[in-house]
Amino acid sequence: MSRPLLQLALDHSSLEAAQRDVTQLKDSVDIVEAGTILCLNEGLGAVKALREQCPDKIIVADWKVADAGETLAQQAFGAGANWMTIICAAPLATVEKGHAMAQRCGGEIQIELFGNWTLDDARDWHRIGVRQAIYHRGRDAQASGQQWGEADLARMKALSDIGLELSITGGITPADLPLFKDIRVKAFIARRALAGAAKSAEGGGGVPAG
């Protein structure tokens, strides 16, 4: 299994703030994510700006698409994204349309696993050609003290066995990494930890290598 990639999630409210973190951290990460909040505030220009700033990085448009998969995929990939997220609750037709456009554009679709979904859903996504999903604890779950548990790991292993590679996020610490040894991990996604590293670097502390 190849080394998991490191993804910087930019959940800023302004592009200027996001690009400051990118300047500090882009040499330490493999993937740069135009987060949902950033894209809602800054529009398609956020993806375009990050592509210009990071010509050699994988760019993710984290749009959590629920409909109009073909149209939005065309816009995302046309703006320079390599991957685009579709929410797990989207109709299978939306996933199919988005995936077909991704294939035409040389990109990939990631299924965002929020809320209710089943392994039968995952099999359907894999059957139509999708090979990536995102598994995470959301902000509210982390705030309530939810930890990575056996149920999470069992579901991730089941997804891996279906053939999906997972990007994992939700308050991961170095001590957590051994928990994922049997999982097909595509990437670990970091938000606040990497942002904190950027602030330390500004103060002269330096950014740890990814």
Predicted regions mapped to residue ranges:
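Active-site beta-loop-alpha junctions enriched in small/polar residues
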Residues: 9-13, 35-39, 64-68, 89, ...
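Conserved N-terminal beta1-alpha1 strand-loop-helix module at the mouth
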Residues: 1-70, 202-210
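Hydrophobic residues within beta-strands of alpha/beta enzymes
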Residues: 32, 84, 133, 188-189
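Alpha-helix-loop-beta-strand connector modules within alpha/beta enzyme cores
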Residues: 40-64, 98-115, 148-174, 206-210
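Conserved anion-binding
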Residues: 2-6, 68-163
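C-terminal helical cap(s) of enzyme catalytic domains, especially alpha/beta-barrels
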Residues: 98, 149, 181, 190-210
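Alpha-helix termination/capping residues and helix-transition junctions
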Residues: 25-28, 53, 78, 127, ...
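Short, acidic/polar
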Residues: 13-25, 67-75, 116-124, 173-178
